Structure formats: structure tokens, C-alpha cells
């Protein structure tokens, strides 16, 4: 019996270190927040870059062309590439010569970066919200249930958009890597959905217990 109590105490201590105040969840929320800010900046900056290059192409202007370049020639891996029938783009970081993004200037490229960027921004933002909620004393709440639900719904919406962009817009054959990446996202969504149900049960039991008291 003493050994049983000892094991229970260890589990309780480990549980307190994972969730609750001054726990692993609290510091994990900081990491998610930093990553969210980093990714969100890139998504917004890339969108601005695509907008400026598109306007420059249509109006034949060179507005901020040193930072947001689009043309038929590009320096790719230290080698100059020129194709009069193809457009390339290169985005640099603000006030810097450091390249941020380089590639083929196509609709598929734009949609891919936009869809993936927005998804990861949402994923990291709700990862931050969920971790922050888990760092509180009362982890069974409507708040965390809502965050988890939004997270797995976002993944289920993202996967078909991701596949459509690659197969239909980018005209890339459905490959094994696309299948496994899509399967991984869906698997995470299923885990999040089951976790949501677990927290729903916990919240219901907690509410019933509060009413009894």
C-alpha cells in the first residue's frame, strides 16, 4: 500500500510539472507564441511581396523591385538562370540583401505558400492558446474545448485545400510524399478530436461535481 501511495505521489508530481502553474505547458506556450509571431510575419511579408510583384508586372513598374523581384532571369544557387517563357521571383528580408524566398512565379506557388503559411499560423496560435490554458489550475474548461475543436477543424479544412493546390492548380501528380504528409495532418486532427472529447467529459464531470458540492 505504501508503494502504491509513493507511485501515486510521483505521478502527481509529474502531472503538476507537465500541466498547471509554472509547468512545462507554460513554457511551451511561450515557444508556440514565438513561432507564431515568426511564421505570421513571413506569411504577411510574402503576401505583400506577391501583391507588389503582381502589380509591377501588370503596370510595368519597378516599385521596390530590389526587395521584391520578378522576371525571366534569376540567380539560382549561384548560377544565373534565364528563360524568356518563364517567370521567377525573389523576395529579400526588409532592409537587407538576405534572400527570404526564391522560386517559380506561378499561381500554384502563391497558393502553396499562402495556404501552408496561414495553416501553420493558425496551428501555432491555437497551440499557444491550448498550452496557455493547460498552464492554469483548472484545465477542464469551455475555453480549451473550443481551442481544440478549432484546431482539428482547421486541419480537416487544410488537407483537401493542400491536395487540391498540388494536384489541380500546380498540376503535380499525387505522390507518396503528398499522401504521407496529408495522412500525418489527418492523424494529428483525429488525436485532437479525441482529446477534445476527453476534455468535454472532464468538464462535464467537473461541472457535476461543483453542483454536488
Feature-to-residue mapping (PLM):
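Terminal transmembrane helical module of multi-pass membrane proteins
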Residues: 171-213
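Membrane-helix exit/juxtamembrane interface segments
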Residues: 44-72
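Transmembrane alpha-helical segments of integral membrane proteins
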Residues: 162-170
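Individual transmembrane alpha-helix segments
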Residues: 87-118
Amino acid at each position: 500500500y505504501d508503494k502504491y501511495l509513493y507511485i501515486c505521489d510521483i505521478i502527481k508530481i509529474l502531472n503538476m510539472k507537465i500541466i498547471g502553474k509554472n509547468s512545462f505547458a507554460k513554457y511551451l506556450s511561450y515557444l508556440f507564441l514565438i513561432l507564431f509571431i515568426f511564421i505570421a510575419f513571413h506569411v504577411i511579408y510574402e503576401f505583400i511581396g506577391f501583391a507588389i510583384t503582381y502589380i509591377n508586372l501588370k503596370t510595368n513598374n519597378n516599385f521596390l523591385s530590389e526587395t521584391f523581384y520578378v522576371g525571366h532571369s534569376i540567380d539560382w544557387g549561384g548560377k544565373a538562370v534565364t528563360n524568356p517563357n518563364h517567370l521567377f521571383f525573389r523576395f529579400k528580408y526588409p532592409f537587407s540583401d538576405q534572400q527570404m524566398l526564391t522560386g517559380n512565379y506561378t499561381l500554384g506557388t502563391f497558393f502553396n505558400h499562402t495556404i501552408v503559411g496561414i495553416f501553420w499560423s493558425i496551428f501555432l496560435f491555437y497551440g499557444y492558446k491550448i498550452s496557455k490554458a493547460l498552464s492554469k489550475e483548472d484545465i477542464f474548461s469551455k475555453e480549451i474545448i473550443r481551442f481544440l475543436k478549432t484546431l482539428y477543424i482547421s486541419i480537416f479544412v487544410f488537407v483537401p485545400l493542400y491536395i487540391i493546390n498540388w494536384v489541380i492548380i500546380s498540376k503535380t501528380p499525387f505522390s507518396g510524399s503528398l499522401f504521407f504528409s496529408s495522412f500525418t495532418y489527418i492523424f494529428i486532427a483525429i488525436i485532437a478530436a479525441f482529446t477534445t472529447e476527453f476534455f468535454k467529459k472532464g468538464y462535464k464531470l467537473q461541472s457535476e461535481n461543483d453542483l454536488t458540492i
